[in-house]
Amino acid sequence: MIAWVYRAARACSLLDQVLIATDSDEVLEFANAHNLAAVFTPEDCASGTDRVHAVAESIGADIYVNIQGDEPLVRPEHLDALLEPMARPEVEVSTVAVRCAPDQINNPNAVKVVTAQDGRALYFSRATIPYDRDNARGIAYRKHLGIYAYRRDALQRFPKLPPSSLEAAEKLEQLRFLENGIDIYVGETPYDTIGVDTEEDLRTVEAILSKDR
């Protein structure tokens, strides 16, 4: 699964370097055996953003991209959409969203995002946002995909900020940025992904990947 994510990232022409960041000896051995560039990070990284920050301590770059290793359906088009907002120098952090399928709207594992007209994220939630009070059924809900791009300064600030109350309630690390006044801009993609959190997710993804071979 990690190899699929790694190769998808390598296929994105906008990325200069791709690394697997892990605190697992098993993953590091797998990466070395398959010629996948990897670095070892501390075990106490509480989130993916903390792990990318650990990498940034020793590897310099202007922009860092965070792709979860359990997202094997990530494709280069996701990364193009992710990095598009970063072309604007005032954007410090970006992420990606896709139109939410009807059966996912009320699923707390499908994180929803609402944005301003300029693409700036107003809030991320496991709840159904926005709430359709009058049942108008005309709302285009958007599902957040857990990939991020950060400018170095924003990434360096993240671990120095105290975990926010919203972050603790929702278990969503990106809310720490928002609560501390660091805007996140959201790129749009038509391509959904499936994070592998359960055996059922794994079977679904394996079926999709087998069709693409």
Task: Say what each PLM segment does.
Residues 75-164:
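Conserved core of the sugar-phosphate nucleotidyltransferase
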Residues 19, 25-84:
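Short phosphate-binding loop-to-helix
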Residues 22-23, 74, 150, 197:
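A conserved hydrophobic position in a structured secondary element of the catalytic/binding core
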Residues 18-20, 64, 121, 184:
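Hydrophobic/aromatic residues located in beta-strands of well-ordered beta-sheets
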Residues 139-213:
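Conserved alpha/beta core of the MobA/IspD/sugar-nucleotide pyrophosphorylase nucleotidyltransferase superfamily
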Residues 1-21:
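N-terminal glycine-rich phosphate-binding loop and ensuing alpha1 helix
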Residues 15, 61, 88-91, 182:
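Short, high-confidence coil segments that cap the C-terminus of an alpha-helix
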